[in-house]
From Swiss-Prot:
Native species: Mus musculus
Positions that bind ATP: L656, G657, R658, G659, Q660, Y661, G662, V663, V664, K679
Transmembrane feature ranges: none
The protein's role, per its UniProt record: Acts as a positive regulator of ERK phosphorylation downstream of fibroblast growth factor-receptor activation. Involved in the regulation of both caspase-dependent apoptosis and caspase-independent cell death. In the skin, it plays a predominant role in suppressing caspase-dependent apoptosis in response to UV stress in a range of dermal cell types.
Protein name: Dual serine/threonine and tyrosine protein kinase
Reactions listed under catalytic activity: L-seryl-[protein] + ATP = O-phospho-L-seryl-[protein] + ADP + H(+); L-threonyl-[protein] + ATP = O-phospho-L-threonyl-[protein] + ADP + H(+); L-tyrosyl-[protein] + ATP = O-phospho-L-tyrosyl-[protein] + ADP + H(+)
Residues forming the catalytic site: D775 (proton acceptor)
Domain Protein kinase: 650-904
First-listed, main subcellular location of the protein, grouped into a coarse class: cytoplasm
GO biological process, one term: cellular response to fibroblast growth factor stimulus
Name of a matching Pfam family: Pkinase
SMART domains linked to this entry: S_TKc
Amino acid sequence: MEADGQSWAGESVSGPGPGGGGMIRELCRGFSRYRRYLGRLRQNLRETQKFFRDIKCSHSHSCPSSPAGGGAAELGPAGDVAEAPLPAGQLSCISFPPMEETYLQQLVDRLPCILILGQDCNAKCQLLNLLLGVQVLPTLKLDSDESCKLRRLRFTYGTRTRVSLALPGQYELVHTLASHQDNWETIPEEDLEVQEDSEDAAHVLADLEVTMHHALLQEVDIVVAPCPSHRPSVDVLSDLANDFLPVITYALHKDELSERGEQELREVRQYFSFPMFFFKVPKLEIISSSSGRAESERSPLYGQLVDLGYLSSSHRNCVPSDQDCKAQSMLVEQSEKLKQLSTFSHQLLQNRLVDAAKALNVVHSHCLDIFINQAFDMQRDLQITPKRLEYTRKKENELYESLMNIANRKQEEMKDMIVETLNTMKEELLDDAANMEFKDVIVPENGETIGTREIKSCIRQIQELIISRLNQAVANKLISSVDYLRESFVGTLERCLQSLEKSQDVSVHITSNYLKQILNAAYHVEVTFHSGSSVTRMLWEQIKQIIQRITWVNPPTITLEWKRKVAQEAIDSLSASKLAKSICSQFRTRLNSSHEAFAASLRQLEAGHSGRLEKTEDLWLKVRKDHAPRLARLSLESRSLQDVLLHRKPKLGQELGRGQYGVVYLCDNWGGHFPCALKSVVPPDEKHWNDLALEFHYMRSLPKHERLVDLHGSVIDYNYGGGSSVAVLLIMERLHRDLYTGLKAGLTLETRLQIALDVVEGIRFLHSQGLVHRDIKLKNVLLDKQNRAKITDLGFCKPEAMMSGSIVGTPIHMAPELFTGKYDNSVDVYAFGILFWYICSGSIKLPEAFERCASKDHLWNNVRRGTRPERLPVFDEECWQLMEACWDGDPLKRPLLGIVQPMLRSIMDRLCKCSSEQPNRGLDDST
């Protein structure tokens, strides 16, 4: 039911008392700012969740379709992104940590709400009136807490004034209130109190909800806590904290806290860590006067709050300009200083936003680093796997040819070895045969004959004995001939195969294991002639056939002499030359068979790796072109949100210069850094946004280095150019001038060579971090007031694994291979060679060979054909040789910067010493 109360639309900023319109405007501005930045944080979180869902979908075997559109369906419950992990693979570790996601989701879902606690109901009502600037609640009630029955009051925004009873989070009660009966300016007391004699339980539990057309309520809801005797403050705060971010105020009107008040605050602090704003409301009869106590004097209230842990003994209220001040509890005893509530709420809300932005940026940065590391791993896999396969094929072929040579030339040696072995072992074999006890054959002790089947079994066992003993002896001698090959070839091959089978592709893993088994069966077992192996028995199959030709006339008696005779006949029937020929023949046959099986398995492995590498290359492309840039942009937004919250938007000073992609301004002070340079970049399209975001990530990820320009932070200006575009403001260290300007003004030889050393040191550091600058030139080398150099503008800087082969850079500094799209960090060495030409010349004049070029295409064609800067008369021989080495057309012939650096030091020591002794010798000073 609607009440006929007064409208406060025109009075919302001009009410009586110490609240005043200024305080209300500040509060409105603070909560409005929080909502604005919370919206950006919510959008970033939504896009981050969608990013992780897309990652999971694109790299899972099956994925349900994502719901269209935004809203709750798109966001899903907190933590659902990480429930189903990615399958094993390169990106299986990319997921949104559930704890961080839950925390962030809860934060963006909870809007702020001002909660008013207090010593008694009068103080709470009076503080509410001060906040709204109008007399909404009565303040002439009884002071006795025991007689107070104030229910919970909730003030929200609406176009018309309305008062009603409602169960929290449920439904509105149809109940006639006193405020419904007539016009009113102050809500009647009977509507505020709980009628405990009421038979309706819902009426006792209900909140009084007041809807008002008020500027402050348009930004934030206000809840007045009920009387503690009706409901404890801890329970009220617990319910509120589930759905809102409470900004807790505590209204005081006495000089000291009562025992009951201390207990209430002690319980709140025990369960919650929220700071509180303690405000002593003015006495009703002197509402416009201030307290007589000086601010510097500490009241009994202050001491009590220190004892309770809300304030520290050295506590000083943070001033608004201190952006890094953490939200702490405040005590304000001067009524005219109620405006400090805006400072308190600003710090509280800002800290929440900053903490959330930091947590989100940590997730972005961590996953982005994983992407970059995985890109390196994938690039190495693409490069090294084909080389490993080729190496395996080559080594196996060498092993095969070596073993075939052994089989061809060892036949005579093997014959002599067999004859020698037989002669050496003959008596031992005969004795062993005579003393042999047969298995599964019963030999009569009385000398009776046995059947033909038993005789054949006995002969076969004697033959097996001779074969096995002879086999072992021959094998032990033969192994020494080829054992070194097993160590040299098989071990290397097995290690190479082990590296190849580390693939996570199951089919390739099986293929590689099969190949390894083939290798062991074909070479390792056969070469070493392990006893009992199937291969060894096959090699001696012909020996069995020869021995089996032994004949007998009548079934003999099994005696020692008979056993020796059978063994003697078996030994005599062996032909050493035939055995050697048979062994070598089977050896060659087996080698050929194994070689073919190996080659077939290697082709199968190669095919498996080919498919895997194709998928890896596709994934590498996705990481470089889609995943990493998309996540980098989210990271840029979350970090920029953190920076603007902490340090506000920087003020643009005078223009310092313009580049291809942005304008550089002077910025006097930002984030505690002075002075600064501000680079304003308006990305024209998605690609430039992605490049800028990645550049920012690389710069922020780099440790500070004295040869690189520091990046202090970034801010995204959504209203750049009057709202016509969105700009990224990069706030950096400001230096004195660039190298182009320095050379133009004139620098001494020693200074120029020191600049060259500084540049090499900076490039070496970038390379040590896996980055390639790709645009080393005069304008990108800045000088401080001591003319020490720092490298700037990492706009084209990328890790090698993230480079797509795009043609970037400044034409005269671009290495020839840049035009092919296949290059590495040696392009920076080439660019340094050109830069060193300018440094040695002491001038900004273009090399003559480049000056003659009419266009960029003409210049590029000449560079590809080998055109380089000319040698000037002032050049020292060693300097010229260093330039030529650096800009060599073959990247492999360019010196490493670790070699260039000591060469430069040597040149500097020699030339500067010579210059001091003979000023006109060698390089001239351009001063």
